[in-house]
Regions:
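Polar, S/T/G-rich
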Residues: 1-233, 240-243, 247, 253-257
Length: 260
């Protein structure tokens, strides 16, 4: 009777208010104490109360389930008061590995049209020659493109077509920081190969206003979808604890680790 009263007699068909789906719960046993979320699956006087309690990772995944990466709170906007030209020069230095940054810059082809045996490719981070080195095409210019089956000249502003690609390590840092977690172990920041991993985008007007809004660089998916994709591709698994500390471990490292 007492247990049923603590869950507002939700087994009764005549209750006025619908019971809460989840409730905070504290599990204690001697000095052991953990806080989680209790979910009641069924209640009856015959079988009692059937429930489950989620801890740590399950609570984290539940909180992030429907959160879009583009809508993460606190996403930075990188502003260059000097304008588009200065921002483009900075990204050019990043492309040449002269300046460390939270992103990489390199050319990718995002589209191509062929008209009368002439190809008209479209690039993010288009490159031209600057004397003996490669340089980003960063000035205002006229480009020839295919529109409705015809080749036409289009005038584009300075910085058009230039867009950095966010490092996966930085995206992970922004995810955990947004929800108050400290990321204490991140192989995407320390492993030589994984530290080069980025998320591509095809946003041609990223820097034309003289700033970089990181929302435009984020993939169009939820946090959970992003983390699941990382696990499928790299075996990276997230572990969190009640102290709001997070660790990312690779499956291969977990399998090969010596038990402590």
């Amino acid at each position: 009777g007492h247990n049923l009263s603590t869950v507002d007699y939700i087994h009764r068909p005549d209750i006025r208010n619908a019971p809460k789906r989840d409730a905070a719960a504290v599990v204690t046993d001697g000095v052991y104490r953990r806080t989680g979320k209790l979910n009641i699956t069924s209640v009856s006087t015959e079988s009692g109360i059937v429930c489950n309690i989620g801890f740590d990772e399950s609570l984290m995944y539940e909180a992030w389930k429907n959160v879009s990466l583009k809508e993460l709170p606190g996403l930075p906007v990188i502003k260059y008061p000097e304008g588009v030209a200065a921002l483009a020069r900075h990204l050019e230095e990043v492309m040449r590995y002269q300046t460390p940054a939270d992103y990489h810059v390199f050319r990718i082809q995002v589209a191509s049209e062929t008209l009368e045996e002439t190809e008209y490719p479209e690039f993010i981070n288009p490159i031209g020659s600057d004397g003996k080195t490669y340089a980003l095409l960063k000035e205002a210019r006229t480009e020839r493109v295919v529109i409705s089956g015809q080749a036409v000249d289009v005038r584009v502003p300075a910085g058009y077509g230039i867009s950095p690609f966010l490092k996966v390590s930085r995206i992970l840092e922004m995810i955990f920081s947004a929800y108050g977690f400290t990321l204490v172990e991140n192989p995407f920041a320390t492993d030589y190969q994984l530290s080069k991993m980025v998320v591509l985008n095809n946003v041609a007007d990223t820097i034309v206003t003289g700033e970089i809004d990181c929302r435009n660089l984020m993939p169009d998916c939820t946090v959970n979808e992003f983390l699941d994709a990382l696990f499928c591709r790299t075996g990276a698994k997230v572990y969190v604890n009640a102290g709001r500390k997070a660790v990312i471990r690779l499956l291969k490292d977990s399998i090969g680790a010596t038990a402590s």
